Amino acid sequence: DAVSRLIYWMGNEYRGVNDFNLNFLKKMNFGLHELHPTAMLIAEDSTSYPGCTKPVDQGGLGFDYKWDLGWMNDTLDYFMKQSGERVSVAERLTFSMFYFYNERHLLPLSHDEVVHGKKTVIDKIFGNYEMKFPQCRALYMYMAVHPGKMLNFMGNEIAMIREWDETKQLDYFLLQYPLHDSFHHYIMDLNKVYLDTPALYEKDYDPEGFKWIAINDMQNNVYGIRRNGKQ
């Protein structure tokens, strides 16, 4: 992906770090923050190279956020399985918190996941047409309560079935169908709850802001999360 190909020679960590490119990234990010303090610089980086989101003056690369591609892959893999098979991959929904605070992670369900035969988010989920919707609502609820900012690509909010095509507009006609219309309203309501609940974002990058309260009932696919705000 984009940033890893700069960090390592041709994106291959076994060929070593590309110091020239690292210096370029540091100078670019530092300069952009100086010129545009409110700009968000986000790295798509699948490697574990340390300090991607650490400030340049502290030895980091200076990005504001980094895509948590591990969270994305694990979460989608979990929801692709039928209910009875999810026990075997139950740790996929908890593993991200073992490394989450190493960087300022962002949770991506991006354009990359709805093109080139990968299927759309809802179409990846196990089950028939009707079965996919409640599971997709659960996926987005999990995303909202998990620490980290959210990136949700256009079309996901209306449960697009057709993959993204940059030459066509989104399939807004889907909103005439009850399941898509209700899903659209669910996403709107979920976003409002998120914005109205400071505990869901105030301490995203502080370990005190998150706690598992139910994690030992994976046989029944039950997870419980507590989020804490500043008050």
Stretches found by the model and what they are:
Residues 178-203:
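Catalytic cores of secreted or luminal carbohydrate-active enzymes
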Residues 1:
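Substrate-binding cleft of carbohydrate-active enzyme catalytic domains
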Residues 5-166, 195-205, 209-230:
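Conserved alpha/beta catalytic core and glycan-binding cleft of carbohydrate-active enzymes
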Residues 165-177, 187:
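Aromatic-rich peripheral "rim/lid" segments of glycoside hydrolase catalytic domains that contact
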